[in-house]
Amino acid sequence: MDPCKFRPSSSFDTKTTTTNPGQPVWNDNEALTVGPRGPILLEDYHLLEKIAHFARDIPEPFVHAGRASAKGFFECTHDVTGLTCADFLPSPGAGTPVIVRFSTVIHERGSPETIRDPRGFAVKFYTREGNWDLLGNNFPVFFIRDGIKFPDVIHAFKPNPKSHVQEYWRVFDFLPHHPESLHTFFFLFDDVGIPTDYRHMDGFGVNTYTFVTRAGKSHYIKFHWRPTCGVSCLMDDEATLVGGKNHSHATQDLYDSIDAGNFPEWKLFVQVIDPEQQDRFDFDPLDDTKTWPEDLVPLQPVGRLVLDRNVDNFFNENEQLAFGPGLVVPGIYYSDDKMLQCRVFAYADTQRYRLGPNYLMLPVNAPKCGFKKNHYDGAMNFMHRDEEVDYYPSRHAPLRHAEPASFPVPTRPVVGKREKTRIKKENDFVQPGERYRSWAPDRQDRFVALRRRLAHPKVSHELRVIWIDFLSKCDKSCGMKVANRLNVKPSM
C-alpha cells in the first residue's frame, strides 16, 4: 500500500500526541528550558511548530466572515428539461448532495447574528458533471449594478478606517451617488432586515443566470429559495434581546435543529424570461438592483433542498468552504449581468489569496465526480499524481476534449462600441416605491423611523435634501415623513 496516495484523515490517529510529521511528543504541557526557570531552548521543535502553526491561521474573509454550514441534498421535483440540459435537473426524483453556507455579509467573525445586515445563502451542488455554486442573499436585489463599484460599497459599509467603528454617515454619504441602491435599502431597513434565524430565511440568486438546452436555446433565470417553515424576522428590540444573550444564536439554532432531527427545508423556484422578450419590460432584466414582478414573470417550481447533517469539522467544512459564481455546469451559464461578470473573477481570486491556488483540492471544495486537469503545481498541492504528461495535447497521453454538445453555451451575437457607460433602463425609483406602498401603515412607520441615522452630524443638510428627494421620487408620502422628522424642506 502506498500511503502517499491517501489523504491524511482521522483514520491515521494514534493513541499518543505527535508532531505534525509524526514524531512522538512526550510533554505538551511545558516548554524545554534550561532548568525549571531558565530560558527556552530553540531546539524545542514541538514548541516552535505549535506556535508557528497557530500564528499562521488563515485570515477571515473580508465579507461573509460570520458563517454557518450544513450538509444535505437537493431533489428535483418538477421537470425542467425544456429549459436546461443540466444533468442533475432531469425528470423529478433526482438527488444531489449539497453543502450550504449561511452568513452575515459585512460584520466580522463573532459579531452578533442579530445585526441589521444582509445574509448570505450559498449552495454548493456536487453534481455528476462538476460542482455548481449558487451564491445568493436573503434579499433579491443588491446595492449596485456594476461590479466596478463593489469594493466601494463594501468599504462604505465596513468600519471607519480611522476609528474601526461602523458609522452609517459613511453609507449615507456614498449611496446618493448610486440611486439604484434604494431598492435594497427598502429591504435592509424594512421588517425583513433581521432574520430570526437561518432556517426562517428566504434565499435569492440576485443575479441573472442562463439556462441552456442541449439544442442551445437560452432563457434568463432568477433563482428563489423559499423556506417551508415560513419567513420570520426580528424587530429591533427583539434583536437586541436575542443578540445580547447569544451572539451565535442563528448558528446554534441551525446546528441544534439538525441534531434533533428537525431538518430545515427550502423549495427552489425559478423565474424565466426569453431573451427575445426582454425589451418588453420597463427595466433591464440583467440589472441586479431590480426584481422581476411575479405577476409578469411567475415562479416555477423546480425542487427542494433539505439539510440533514451538520458539518463534522467547522474549520475543514466551513472556514475552508469556498464558493464562486464561476463554478457552473452544463446547462447553466452566466448572463451579461455586469455584477455577475465581475463576481466570476473576484470570488475565485479571493479564494486563491485566502486558501491558496489549489483550494479546489480541499475535500469540501473538490468535485465528487471524476476530473482531469493539468494545473496541479503551486502551494498545497497534495494530490498524488504519477503521470509523465502535464500538458495538452499529447500523443503519449491521448486526452481528448469533451464534445461541444455536452456543454452548450449561449451563442447570442454581441455588437457594440468599447465604452464605459451606464445601462439605458435605470428606472431606479419605481420598484422601491411599489414596495413601500405594499406595506401596512405601521410597517411604513417603522421604515421611516430607521431613517433617524440621517440625523447624524456628518450627514450634511445637502445630503439630507438629496435623500429626501430620492425617497420622494419613490413615494411622495415617504419623502414627506422623513423630511418632517428631520425638519428639512423637500426640494419637490
Curated annotation (Swiss-Prot):
Q: Where is the active site?
A: H64, N137
Q: Which UniProt keywords apply?
A: Cytoplasm, Heme, Hydrogen peroxide, Iron, Metal-binding, Oxidoreductase, Peroxidase, Peroxisome
GO molecular function terms noted in the UniProt entry: catalase activity; heme binding; metal ion binding
| Cellular compartment(s) | Cytoplasm, Cytosol; Peroxisome matrix
Q: Where is the composition biased (Polar residues)?
A: 8-22
Q: Provide GO CC annotations from the record.
A: cytosol; peroxisomal matrix; plasma membrane
Q: Where does heme bind?
A: Y347
Cite the Pfam families for this sequence. Answer: Catalase, Catalase-rel
Gene3D superfamilies xref list: Catalase core domain
Region ranges (Disordered): 1-30
The cofactor(s) it depends on are:
heme
Kindly give the CDD domains that the UniProt entry links to this protein. Answer: catalase_clade_1
Under SMART domains, the record lists: Catalase
- Tell me which EC number(s) this protein carries: 1.11.1.6
Q: How does it assemble?
A: Homotetramer.
Please explain the role this protein plays, according to its UniProt record. Catalyzes the degradation of hydrogen peroxide (H(2)O(2)) generated by peroxisomal oxidases to water and oxygen, thereby protecting cells from the toxic effects of hydrogen peroxide.
What family does the Swiss-Prot or TrEMBL record give for this protein? Belongs to the catalase family.
What is the name of this protein?
Catalase
